[in-house]
Amino acid sequence: MPPAADLRLVVGYDGSPPSARALDAAVSLLRGRAGGIEVTYVAHLPSMAALSAGAIGEMETDFDDIERELRGMAGEQLAGREERWVLQRRQGPIVEELLAAAKDAATAHADATVVIVVGSSSQVTHRVLGSVAVGLARHSPVPLIIVP
């Protein structure tokens, strides 16, 4: 990829080893370029039809705790390496929300090149049923990097 004048990297991040590798790759991609990293945590609720209002509220509190933990993990991983990052939390289906985050980044930075960066999954269920990376590969209107 030729150096972009402004590179905006949307990194899918959940604290897992694949997402940590994706974040490391984003740091390498951004080195020497203008831009920033949008570390994106997607809080995904299962089908809410079977959940009570109390259960949904409790899950929201859990998501707040997870967001704080992930912000700390990302901060530690990026400390001394990259300071141009923000963590955003989105809620909904993971693929749809990462695509929406990329669209929002493109809208906010009209002259930037937006790239989604995610880690690959080695879980058998993901290989059989599909993973976030596969869903993004099928639907992403922006460049996508899947880090092994």
Regions found by a protein language model. Name each.
Residues 1-4, 76-116, 123:
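Structural beta-alpha unit
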Residues 2-53, 139:
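Small/aliphatic-rich secondary-structure junction motif
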Residues 22-23, 49-52, 97-100, 127-129:
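Short, well-ordered secondary-structure micro-motifs
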Residues 38-40, 86-90, 145:
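General small-molecule cofactor/ligand-binding pocket signal
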